[in-house]
Design a protein with these regions (language model features):
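Classical Sec-dependent N-terminal signal peptides that target proteins to the secretory pathway
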Residues: 1-23
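N-terminal secretory-pathway/extracellular module detecting exported/lumenal segments
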Residues: 22-87, 91-189
């Protein structure tokens, strides 16, 4: 019985220790060297909103014709005394970048096709070329302490997905892409 108890304590320590390393406070989110605030029309200007952890942005292996990026973001809700940590991964289809679609359209115009330019906009709205996945990374109080409350998966996804062209949720994956590769996704040929 004593062994089970000690094993349980050890296991609990292994599970909580990694979560404490990811915890952030409201004050830390305001450090512009580590976090970048993602402007949103929903922000009140009182420290709420989404923050990208610049140190977490990294490219990961992707199939041919794609690029993938992982990062951590934090959604701050000061009035609720809550910060929601999220681990996100975006997949970018290189043949769906705006520059690629414009180049393909220009080539078809040179070959006599009379498709109007608005078709590029419509094609991009149908499929932005960016798909994302979101995982809950933990919930924290504004002071950085771990909070046991969890946000529902539907709410997590609604905060940043889907990345539709022309929509506010399109900013985050584009910011991540620019941080990882030094060029905007839609400027890729």
């Amino acid at each position: 019985m004593k062994r089970i108890y000690l094993f349980s304590l050890w296991l609990l320590g292994c599970l909580i220790a990694p979560m404490q390393g990811q915890a952030v406070s409201q004050a830390e989110l305001l450090n512009s060297e580590r976090f970048e605030h993602i402007d949103s029309s929903a922000d009140s200007g009182r420290g709420d909103g989404k923050y990208l952890d610049l140190s977490s942005v990294k490219s990961v292996t992707a199939p041919n014709g794609h690029r993938r990026i992982e990062a951590s973001i934090y959604v701050s809700m000061p009035a609720a005394n809550m910060i929601q940590g999220l681990s996100v991964q975006y997949d970018y289809q290189m043949d769906r970048s705006l520059r690629h679609l414009i180049n393909a359209h220009d080539n078809s115009l040179k070959q006599g096709d009379k498709t109007p330019y608005i078709s590029i906009w419509r094609a991009k709205q149908e499929n932005s070329g960016i798909t994302g996945t979101v995982n809950d990374d933990g919930t924290y109080y504004n002071n950085g302490q771990i909070r046991q409350q969890r946000v529902y998966a539907e709410n997590l996804k609604a905060m940043i997905l889907p990345a539709e062209f022309g929509d506010e949720k399109y900013k985050l994956p584009n910011l991540m892409y620019k941080k990882a590769y030094g060029i905007a996704y839609d400027d890729e040929p």
